[in-house]
C-alpha cells in the first residue's frame, strides 16, 4: 500500500511539473497564438511570449524557463548587432494531414531577421504546442 501511495504521489508531482494544461481549440487559435508570440518577440517581450505558449506546451516548467532565459540573453545580444525590430512577416504554414501544423514567422530588424518556428500537434483534446524554436538562419527559407 505504501508503495502504491508513493507511486501515485510521484506520478502526480511529475505531472504537475509540466506546464501544459490547456488546449487550443482549432487552427485559427494556433494561427493567432503564433502571430501573438511573433509580435511579442518584435516588442522584445520574451517573457510574455513564453508565458503565452506555456499553458499549451507539454514540457517541464524548468525546461521552458531555461529556454526563456537563454532566449532573452541571445535576443538582446542579437539586437545589438542587427538593430531595432521593424515588423513581423508570416513566411509559411506547413501541415501533416489534420494532425500537425508548422508556422514560420520572421521578426524583421533593421539589418537582418530572426526566424520563429511553431509546431502544433492535434490530440483528442485539441491542439498543443509540440515545438517552438527560433534562430537567425532565415536564409534557409529561400526555395
Task: Mark where each language-model region is.
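Short, low-complexity N-terminal intrinsically disordered segments enriched in polar/charged residues
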Residues: 18-43
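Positively charged n-region of N-terminal signal peptides that target proteins for export
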Residues: 1-4
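Exposed beta-sheet edge and beta->alpha loop/turn motif
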Residues: 91-143
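Short, linear, compositionally biased motifs with a strong N-terminal bias
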Residues: 10-11
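Short solvent-exposed beta->alpha transition segments
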Residues: 25, 31-32, 50-99
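N-terminal signal peptide c-region/cleavage motif recognized by signal peptidases
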Residues: 14-16
